[in-house]
Regions:
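N-terminal, positively charged/glycine-rich alpha-helical extensions of SAM-dependent methyltransferases
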Residues: 1-35
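A short glycine-rich, Lys/Arg-flanked "PGG" loop and its adjoining helix->strand segment in the class I
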Residues: 150-157
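Class I SAM-dependent methyltransferase Rossmann-like catalytic core
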Residues: 32-47
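Short catalytic micro-motifs in class I SAM-dependent methyltransferases
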Residues: 138-142
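Conserved alpha-helix/loop element of class I SAM-dependent methyltransferases that forms part
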Residues: 45-65, 82
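A conserved beta-strand element that flanks and buttresses the S-adenosyl-L-methionine
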Residues: 135
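Class I SAM-dependent methyltransferase SAM/SAH-binding core
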Residues: 70, 76-123
Length: 157
């Protein structure tokens, strides 16, 4: 993962704003719009899985059992569960989550073989090319600062 000099004061401000956004969302977590028992939510999840399968095929990642994946912003671990369902092996999965409570939820839901790293993704110190895939799903929709988005994208690349 590439490095770029980081202005820690700007980073801290945006990181705190992300934390506050997720705090506000907690109140809505049990809203019907998130329930997989709602057919439209369930169909959306299925479409996401179909898109993931298409991407795996187009990126020529199959077979996936030996692919190493890092997910930035793993939340409660739903994407990692989906990857395992498609054949990715837990010992080859690593997750990063900024928010402590979400990282703990992921730890409780996911197999112990999955490494979960708590904290800011910009602070990750992982060897170059230690992953076949660096994945994020909705991280950039939670970060509104363009410069911070750029730094994170560079880090992931």
């Amino acid at each position: 993962m590439a490095e770029r000099p980081v202005d820690r004061s700007e980073e801290a401000g945006e990181t705190e704003r992300v934390r506050l956004r997720y705090e506000r969302r907690k109140a809505d977590i049990n809203a019907p719009i998130y329930s997989p028992l709602d057919p439209s939510v369930y169909m959306g999840q299925q479409e996401k899985e179909r898109a993931l399968i298409r991407w795996i095929q187009q990126a020529d990642l199959a077979p996936v059992h030996d692919r190493r994946v890092l997910e930035i912003g793993c939340g409660s671990g739903g994407n990692l569960l989906q990857l395992m369902k498609l054949g990715f092996v837990p010992k080859n999965l690593t997750a990063n989550e900024l928010l402590e409570d979400r990282a703990e939820l992921a730890r409780n839901l996911l197999p112990s073989a999955i490494r979960i790293i708590k904290g800011n993704a910009l602070d990750l110190d992982l060897p170059e090319e230690s992953f076949d895939v660096v994945h994020q799903s909705t991280v950039f929709s939670s970060i509104l600062d363009d410069e911070f988005q750029g730094k994170l994208a560079d880090k992931m690349w």
